[in-house]
């Protein structure tokens, strides 16, 4: 999620510019904005960075990469892109909304963060469709479910995400607000522009992909229940029932989708509510920052879900560790030999 965005929902400076003049509420929000929130985001940043690098490293070093591995690797890369912008966000919040890194970096960080939003939603949607065909229609679209074509599909999704984020590349800049604070924000001066952009971002990154994701997994659950009933009635092993490995992968993606909904829904609801508010209340302010924390927390939680829910990752990590250790021992032996 992009807290750098539009002038109507960027930082505490922007929200206070909407004539929110209650002294206690403002002081409370200021403490949250400059102390508590940067600390929380910093913890999320450090754990998410380690976890996602571990996932990407594990998949890249794996000898047998599966189609789901490619999607998971791209989601981990997207989470890393999300995390890269965190230190800049922390710095801006800690300084009361002031941006000191210049206009070009403001545009790059804001645009990459938005591109990441589009990419995460698109990859999650396509991965859900892939799980549906792998489980319910295993003999359809098999030519498209190869590793090579899956890589091309993911590259296409990233390219489309950059195109969809073009408005941010154009309009994100350093803006000087009425209180004199220069912040990195999305320069939308017209209320109509704010309305249309908010709807554009909310629909394309959440409300459009969400039904597709839910439909895929509802169909998967219906199919699984039907196969279970057939086996139970026939009292035999039906070869069409998904294998344990596929079921584990499906369970993993189901949990990831649940995390996607819980982390993204509050943020987008807050944006829609903000369109109707003249003066933000303390409750709105708290909800706004909680939604940002939830959105960034998902980038930290996802890699640990991959490890906990996937038997493949649990097996691969020790194997890769042994391979790396053996390689280091071999290199050390060669180094010692060269000195004697």
From Swiss-Prot:
The chain crosses the membrane at residues 35-57, 70-92, 107-129, 150-172, 199-221, 253-272, 287-309. Keywords: Cell membrane, G-protein coupled receptor, Glycoprotein, Membrane, Receptor, Transducer, Transmembrane, Transmembrane helix. Residues 58-69, 130-149, 222-252, 310-340 are cytoplasmic. GO terms for cellular component: plasma membrane. It is found in: Cell membrane. InterPro entries: GPCR_Rhodpsn, GPCR_Rhodpsn_7TM, MCH_rcpt, MCHR2. Glycans are attached at residues 10, 17. Residues 1-34, 93-106, 173-198, 273-286 are extracellular. GO terms for molecular function: G protein-coupled peptide receptor activity. Its main location: membrane. Specifically expressed in the brain with highest levels in cerebral cortex, hippocampus and hypothalamus, and lower levels in caudate nucleus, putamen and thalamus. Pfam families: 7tm_1. One of its GO terms (biological process) is neuropeptide signaling pathway. It is a multi-pass membrane protein. PANTHER family: MELANIN-CONCENTRATING HORMONE RECEPTOR 2-RELATED, NEUROPEPTIDES RECEPTOR. Receptor for melanin-concentrating hormone, coupled to G proteins that activate phosphoinositide hydrolysis. Belongs to the G-protein coupled receptor 1 family. This is Melanin-concentrating hormone receptor 2. It comes from Macaca mulatta (Rhesus macaque).
